[in-house]
Amino acid sequence: MGKLFVISAPSGTGKTSLIQAVLEDPVASNTYLGISYTTRKARPKEEDGVSYFFVSQMSFMEKVKNNDFLEYAEVFGNFYGTPKDWVLSVLSKKENVLLELDIQGALQVKKAFPEAKTVFIIPPSYEDLTKRLESRDQDSKTEIAKRLKEARNEVNIGKDFDQVIVNDDFDAALEDLKQFMFTSEGVTNERSEIIKNSLDLLLD
């Protein structure tokens, strides 16, 4: 069996960019990104079957009824689900699966697959996260406030994941992610100390 990795993070933390970068590295040649089903509308540049499988709520609920999802969750009014058969098929070929999920989904997968390795990515500070959300220019002030409140709740849960990574420096965070996923040594002691300090700051 291959390995199942689950990566979660508050919105605006740079999770998607880190995942794209790790998958482009030769070390991840046998690691595949899971594509979720979702009922939300596609954003600009998102493609059906590449970014997500975009479906109606009726179609999604039919899949829930048929037990087609490894996990599913409602996030900000939209549903997301991970196709079970695809994940099991890839793992059975001794290849790895990387799932990019919200924290609810990550917890569901860990419960169903205790051997899954969970990663939670944090910002260096809430001030930094606020700036990132504002610079995306895709959310209203009300939406940003909602996401920041949600981020605080998520950090309280994500602190107990198998590995926490702080995206204070993109290259360093990418190296931490690769170390955790593909080496037996894991994250270096120096970076572990930085991660611990950042987490303490967010939990204070």
At which residue positions do the language-model features occur?
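The conserved Walker
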Residues: 9-11
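Post-Walker A helix-loop "phosphate-sensing" segment adjacent to the P-loop in P-loop NTPases
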Residues: 24-33
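Pre-Walker A (Motif I) flank of P-loop NTPase domains
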Residues: 1-5
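NTP-dependent small-molecule kinase module
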Residues: 138-139, 156-204
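ATP-dependent small-molecule kinase phosphotransfer cores
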Residues: 36-97, 104-107
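Conserved phosphate-donor/acceptor-positioning beta-strand/loop module used by diverse small-molecule
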Residues: 97-102, 111-135, 166-169
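Walker A/P-loop
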Residues: 16
